[in-house]
Amino acid sequence: MHIKRTLLAIACATLTLAASAQDFNKHFEDRTLRLDYNFSGTNRTQQISLDELSQSPGWYGRRHNLDSLLIRGNGQLEVKLPDSGKTIYRYSFSTLFQEWQSSEEATKVQKSFENVFLMPFPKQPVDVTITLSDTHNHVSASLTHRVDPKDILIRQIGTTGQTPWKYVHQGGDSKEVIDVAILAEGYTEKDMDTFWEDCKMAKESFLNHEPFKSLQDKFNFIAVFSPSKESGISIPHKNLWVNTVMGSNYDTFYSERYLTTLKLKRVHDLLSGIPYEHIIILANTENYGGGGIYNSYMMSSAHNVKTRPVIVHEFGHSFGGLGDEYFYDDQYETMYPADTEPWEPNLTTLVDFDSKWKDMLPTNAKKSKIAKTIKGIDITEPDGKDLYTKVGVYEGGGYQSKGVYRPVQECRMKINEAPVFCPVCDRAIRRIVKYYTE
């Protein structure tokens, strides 16, 4: 009896995989279509412009769940068949442009930001729609355009002149696992031995940390040896400017520790023809800092005493779509409006708590002290015990001390000292991995 059940389970799994492959092969080729856009505007306006289309050999993104989304993000890409209107591919993301819109600078000037998205190369003409949403999850900008795979102006890239690369960790075939590229920023040709050691450090930071440790056969980590003309990273508040391959700098949006690059086209140029789906950028500096943007990239200093936890934290943003759980009393006051449920799986405003970690709350017998009750939901009183594992509803998160709630007292998404992701973040990452690979 057990043998029959096992054989039936194997048969069902095989049929599911075959159906996924069939669906992919029906609509797409084993190539990548790269779409370059410019997002521009002010704090109140948004405009989307198509810049360029290009194609490269191989598709290294997901081949499962092509027409569904696990996380909403602040923006979405949707691909439809023109005749039937059938959705054949969806992708969600966040952008630095939308984050910039909440800054004081955005009230004074209009700016433009590069954005690059990848999708499998279609076998027939498709309609591609890019949609941006505001903090209330209302559509704030949208652009739909036709892509004809026979268009002679779709530039061919990635066939020659690839940036040198090699695997740091290979969990499996690129068609079955998640490819993560690790790029060098601020490393000269002479620094590449150091970069290789830094890549191994980054890989170990992930694979020694749950849930990545248990899921290491689901990931490939690839070192990409992208040389800069000068060593180091630009730090504007110290009047230090360095000629680096991706032009990154600290002081993003005038925040000293916020390390990013705005040159996304350059980032993807360096990766042309290389297996990649997610991007890590290691910065050759001891200066503390980093940044992570959901389904865009994450960046971290490589030589700071806190580099290891920062790398894991920022990957939580860029890969897992996790929100920051720390908070202030006077910043980002409108980042998470009280009438809108955040899309990040580890934050809630209680508008739709059922969709978050309500099912993970302890039974009545094991509940902690209740601070207050809002919308029928008990808000947990912090007690300093079981800091990283006791799931509750703790007020303070998403940069706001009031009105936004987090799952535990301390988590990797709140402080560097936390040794683990909390149970809610752990589950969210595992779900993402399953979404990409099954």
Tell where the protein language model's regions lie, with residue ranges.
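Beta-strand-enriched, solvent-exposed domains that form extended recognition/catalytic surfaces
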Residues: H27-I152
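Short pre-active-site segment immediately N-terminal to the catalytic Zn-binding motif
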Residues: T194, G291-E314
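Fold-level signature of zinc-dependent metallopeptidase catalytic domains
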Residues: I154-E210, A223-I233
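Bacterial N-terminal signal peptides that target proteins for export
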Residues: M1-L8
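Catalytic Zn2+-binding segment of zinc metalloproteases
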Residues: F315-Q331
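Active-site-proximal segments of metallohydrolase catalytic domains
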Residues: K218-Y294
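Hydrophobic h-region of N-terminal signal peptides that target proteins for export
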Residues: C12-S20
